């Protein structure tokens, strides 16, 4: 994974965080 742009860094971080949150929500819902 290469990250040269700083703007893309927070975007990727946010995306990963959102994915993790969704996984947790699904786990709790189940």
UniProtKB/Swiss-Prot annotation:
It comes from the Bacteria. Induction: Expressed during exponential and stationary growth. It is found in: Cell inner membrane. Disulfide bonds: none annotated. Keywords: Cell inner membrane, Cell membrane, Membrane, Stress response, Toxin-antitoxin system. Signal peptide: none annotated. Transcription of the aapA3 gene generates a full-length transcript whose folding impedes translation. Processing of the 3' end of the aapA3 message generates a shorter transcript that becomes translatable after a structural rearrangement. One of its GO terms (cellular component) is plasma membrane. Belongs to the AapA toxin family. May be involved in response to oxidative stress. Toxic component of a type I toxin-antitoxin (TA) system. Neutralized by cognate antisense RNA antitoxin IsoA3 RNA which forms an extensive duplex with the mRNA. The antitoxin gene cannot be deleted, indicating expression of AapA3 is toxic. Non-cognate antitoxin RNAs IsoA1, IsoA2, IsoA4, IsoA5 or IsoA6 are unable to neutralize aapA3. Oxidative stress may trigger transformation of the bacteria to a coccoid form via the AapA type I TA systems. The peptide may penetrate the membrane leading to lipid reorganization and thinning of the bilayer. This is Toxic protein AapA3. It comes from Helicobacter pylori (strain ATCC 700392 / 26695).
